[in-house]
């Protein structure tokens, strides 16, 4: 099996002025494509090693599967949870659960923004299937700090390639801009999926 890069669910300039066409083009076509290529290359190495019975390079390939596979999956989520029609707050069951698990939307958002400021990769809202609750997590790179058994609901990429061209070192401005394009329909669907699977 090989993995492919899906097109963005909107035009490259659709999120302007919050995220520029140039950043989306670089981010999707170069960075995200690189994770897809890296995942495919690592899988090829593993398949060749299994066939040959030689496993000297398998440990490195396994790490590359984790890093690049997680990068591909998280980027897919990132693109899907934004749209030019975004910018509202969540509604319905997800909004109620955020209020239940965090106290309020404002408390969740403040904690999520803190995660985004600290992360060396991603801030994620996840459904923790062990505790049956929503949590914010700080993920470095694509795979360090993830919580086992968690189901991602909302993903924010805070690698520098996501914002530096548009915002320079002002990551907080980029995080604020992200909330102007968040489309809660996809996270709400992912939350409903998690509840069906785990509750």
Swiss-Prot record:
Q: Which UniProt keywords are listed?
A: Manganese, Metal-binding, Oxidoreductase
Q: What is its EC number?
A: 1.15.1.1
Q: Which PROSITE patterns match?
A: SOD_MN
Note how many cofactor molecules are bound and how.
Answer: Binds 1 Mn(2+) ion per subunit.
The prosthetic group or cofactor this protein requires is: Mn(2+)
Record GO terms (molecular function): metal ion binding; superoxide dismutase activity
Chain positions recorded as Mn(2+) binding sites: 28, 75, 157, 161
Reactions it catalyzes: 2 superoxide + 2 H(+) = H2O2 + O2
Q: Which Pfam families match?
A: Sod_Fe_C (PF02777), Sod_Fe_N (PF00081)
NCBIfam families (UniProt xref)? Superox_dis_Halo
Query: What's this protein's function?
Result: Destroys superoxide anion radicals which are normally produced within the cells and which are toxic to biological systems.
Q: Which family does it belong to?
A: Belongs to the iron/manganese superoxide dismutase family.
Q: What is this protein called?
A: Superoxide dismutase [Mn] 2
Q: Which organism is it from?
A: Haloferax volcanii (strain ATCC 29605 / DSM 3757 / JCM 8879 / NBRC 14742 / NCIMB 2012 / VKM B-1768 / DS2)
The gene from which this protein is expressed is: sod2
